[in-house]
Amino acid sequence: MEYSYPLNPDWTTEEMTIVVQFLEAIERAYEKGIDTLELKEKYRAFKQVVPAKGEEKRIGIDFEKASGYSAYKVMQLVKNATTSKIKMQP
């Protein structure tokens, strides 16, 4: 699938990398499944770059429009997960 990640040009290269790694983890949750602990760690790092809820929501909406993958739905599943790995249903 060809699409671009919603990135802020004001972020440093390191910050962009952190955001992309989180969004790639969301992709893996849909495509292959992902370890819940790994995803939580990626989310914590993402929140260091994007602490504001409004910006987080905007990035999530833009990413879902581009990819079809919902970061919000994945994180809701992770929050309530009782297993060590999750895989989203298409």
UniProtKB/Swiss-Prot annotation:
Residues that span the membrane, as ranges: none
InterPro entries per the UniProt record, alphabetical: BH2638-like_sf, UPF0223
UniProt cross-references to Pfam families, sorted A to Z: UPF0223
Family: Belongs to the UPF0223 family.
Protein name, entry field: UPF0223 protein lmo1058
Native source organism of the sequence: Listeria monocytogenes serovar 1/2a (strain ATCC BAA-679 / EGD-e)
